Amino acid sequence: MEKGENVMSSYKVFTVNPGSTSTKIALFQGGEKIFSANVSHDAEVLAQYQSLEEQLQYRNGTIHQLLEENRVDLSGLDACVGRGGGLLAMEGGVYEIDDLVLDHSIHAAIGVVHPASLGPSIAKQFADRYGAKAYVVNPPDVDELQDLARLTGIRGVYRVIHLHALNLKETAIRHAGKMGRKYEECNFVVCHIGGGISVSAHRKGRMIDGYDIVGGEGPMAPTRCGSISVADLLEYAKGHELKDLKQLCTKSVGFVSHLGVSDAREVIRRAGEGDKYAELVWNTMIYQIEKGIGAMAAALHGNVDGILLGGGMVYSENLVGQIKEACEFIAPVSAYPGEFEMEAMASGAERVLDGVEAVKKYTGMCSFTGFDFA
């Protein structure tokens, strides 16, 4: 994918994206990826730790070891970027990693514990070691909902969103650049279609609406249920423990519930071999994505400059073709298959280093705290 801002620099940027049993790392020089690796961590060793914070030294050690084995030189580093998470709701952008970011991320201030929250701590340690800047870029905690998207039918219950903000915003930034425009000048419906599915509305540089995929909103996905009737959920809840119901949102439903697999390629294979149930499940997911795109287009009052599709499942020509057929009456559909978190993090740092974008300071205050009159 081409870069939207045409940042031509010699900046050296190291990116870190922790997962459950591995940590993805990448080194960029002048906007080009010159090294990348997926650092594996022993699951049995990780299981010995009671918290994310306790994993930090072990993960750092395995990363340093791999870098040394591959003779990767981080001297002259300009910036380190960590994936982020666990922070309180914030506006999108590039944030300096300071003590408050470190505390809130590693202790999951938002109450959602995920290994990606180790990203800022790892990035800061590398940055301090090499005299570089340390940033987080559009973490999953980005929440820029407009007021109309915030209220629900229950007084005091407000919508929040957790979605693939990093990929969504980077896709929009880069596509705007291809159009010869800035992200802040455009309106897009942007989807990330992978293990989780995010559908979002972007107006003039802000993600004004989207589905809370952690909370179960939006289309069905490989392991997620998507939006379902409250009455049906209450009926289903009978005889189930709360912890099991929470798993329902993100772990054990979607493709897994219907077909016993989470790999979209297997679902496509079965459908292609005549499995009518697999075909129905696959097409239903796409149909729900299409409905979500239509809803987000309405949130933009039909003023849509493009419908952008990113994520691993966008490699499927069938998926892209169906969405184009259903939605291209709204705006042109553009496909950017694959995931590019590492590139997105590096691009964010480069924009700040190049003066294209201003770095922000995390306040530790939610971007939404309620309505005065409610």
Residue ranges and their predicted role:
Residues 67-116, 133, 141-152:
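Short beta-strand-loop/turn "lid" adjacent to the catalytic site in phosphate-handling enzymes
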Residues 117-125, 136, 151, 156-187, ...:
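Glycine-rich phosphate-binding loop plus the immediately following alpha-helix
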Residues 337-374:
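Structural signal for terminal/edge beta-strands and the immediately following C-terminal loop/tail
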Residues 13-54:
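Short glycine-rich, Thr/Ser-proximal phosphate-binding strand/loop in the N-terminal lobe
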Residues 317, 321-347:
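Conserved phosphate-binding/catalytic loops in two-lobed NTP-binding clefts
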Residues 247-302:
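Adenine-nucleotide phosphate-binding core of ATP-dependent small-molecule kinases
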Residues 65-78, 178-182, 292-305:
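Phosphate/pyrophosphate-binding loops at sites that engage ATP/ADP/AMP, CoA/4′-phosphopantetheine
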